[in-house]
């Protein structure tokens, strides 16, 4: 048996063998961090939305923390093995998807408010909504990727 034949799903590979997965997981973790800081950078940038600070924690900090944690876990996993067929990657990707969907769904009314009134500017609405779609799309890619069969023999 050669070294290549012995490489299974749990083999340790260099990050260079799966650069797209590793980079994608790092981007996901960075998007989670960005989700956390969005409402706090909104104030100096003039994109503030008048809501209670608890609302910002629930709508940004909590889901962002889930995405950062799961994204870093996925990064660690992707550096060790392919995410294809990894049940823990499916779970982590699902957590990120749900967190991103939470941000998406809680900010849809903000976009609707910006469309129908002058209470909220479009810039503020888009700023607060900015991480939702990228997190949902990227985490869905990881869910689909991890639910695929492992290509290794």
Task: Identify the function of each model-found stretch.
Residues 34-47, 105-113:
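Membrane-helix interface motif
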Residues 20-24, 45-67, 89, 120-131:
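Transmembrane alpha-helix entry/boundary detector in multi-pass membrane proteins
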Residues 27-37, 97-104:
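Short, structured motif recognition centered on aromatic/hydrophobic residues
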Residues 2-31:
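Cytosolic juxtamembrane helix and N-cap/initiation of the first transmembrane helix
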Residues 24, 115-150:
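Alpha-helical membrane-associated segments of multi-pass integral membrane proteins
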Residues 2, 61-72, 128-143:
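Hydrophobic cores of alpha-helical transmembrane segments in multi-pass inner/ER membrane proteins
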């Amino acid at each position: 048996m050669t070294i290549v034949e012995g490489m299974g799903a749990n083999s340790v590979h260099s990050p260079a063998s799966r650069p797209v997965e590793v980079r994608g997981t790092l981007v996901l973790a960075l998007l989670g961090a960005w989700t956390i800081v969005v409402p706090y950078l909104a104030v100096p940038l003039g994109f503030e939305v008048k809501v209670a600070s608890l609302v910002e924690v629930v709508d940004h900090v909590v889901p962002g923390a889930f995405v950062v944690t799961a994204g870093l876990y996925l990064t660690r996993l992707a550096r060790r093995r392919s995410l294809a067929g990894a049940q823990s990657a499916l779970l982590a990707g699902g957590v990120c998807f749900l967190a991103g969907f939470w941000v998406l769904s809680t900010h849809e009314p903000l976009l609707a408010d910006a469309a129908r009134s002058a209470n909220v500017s479009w810039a503020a609405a888009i700023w607060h909504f900015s991480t939702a779609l990228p997190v949902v799309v990227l985490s869905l890619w990881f869910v689909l990727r991890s639910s695929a069969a492992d290509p290794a023999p």
